[in-house]
UniProtKB/Swiss-Prot annotation:
The gene is apaH. Disulfide bonds: none annotated. It comes from Chromobacterium violaceum (strain ATCC 12472 / DSM 30191 / JCM 1249 / CCUG 213 / NBRC 12614 / NCIMB 9131 / NCTC 9757 / MK). Belongs to the Ap4A hydrolase family. This is Bis(5'-nucleosyl)-tetraphosphatase, symmetrical. It catalyses: P(1),P(4)-bis(5'-adenosyl) tetraphosphate + H2O = 2 ADP + 2 H(+).
Amino acid sequence: MAIYAIGDIQGCFEPFQQLLRLIDFNPGKDTLWLTGDLVNRGPQSLEVLRWVFQHQDQVEMVLGNHDLHLLAVSEGFGKIHRDDTIDDVLNAADGKVLLDWLRCQPMMLEGHGYAMVHAGLLPEWTISKALRLAEEVEFGLSGTRYREFLGRLYGNKPTRWTDDLKGVDRLRLIVNVMTRMRFLTRDGELDLSYKGELEGAPANLVPWFEAPNRRHGGTPIVCGHWSALGVHLDEDILAIDSGCLWGGSLSALRLDDKQLFSLPCQAYREIALATGR
């Protein structure tokens, strides 16, 4: 039995299937950990959702920002962006079944000596605290008032965590940290403005996994979200979004021995160049 963590798929169904063949995925024995952003921007979001739904006994996943965007739009919140490719899900006969299942997926999980979250964790959060905070969001998404909850997700504030945060501000910051974060300011505030490579980052920003005094050290964190970072593997951070959608690759990391498998996504590079993405 092997556990394979796979980075952001974002509707790139054909590369996903090719990657499963490359790793010789055996659904009778193996498990997939998906870092979130199953959907959007790629051409086959519906096919990805259907496959994961049909194989949910072999899959563990966390929600990403594009997954949450799909859920919000499906309930009439948020705006369809020019590059969104979620109409196939919204118009599908089985769309409601898939969306009801999707919104009940976790924000974070822990197991086999690892934790997984889409974007990252604040340095002051321990793993156990982060799991409790994730449950607060999961309760809102899966509860009877989930529509109200989805309608309040959008926004970039607040930017600084305190345990005294309550209500919408508290939940929005948890969501933004776990699904959108890349950088913090050097005094610990969430910064969502810069999305590029490490080398080009403003001097006042630090990548979340290099923030000082991180309290979640010791448990390796599997994450995605940051395609400009690419694959970044060190002792306790396993970032595996290698930018398939943008013509990079789709990557799988076998957690048992840290072997990396990458499938080039050249066709998507050509699409990106043609569309100016």
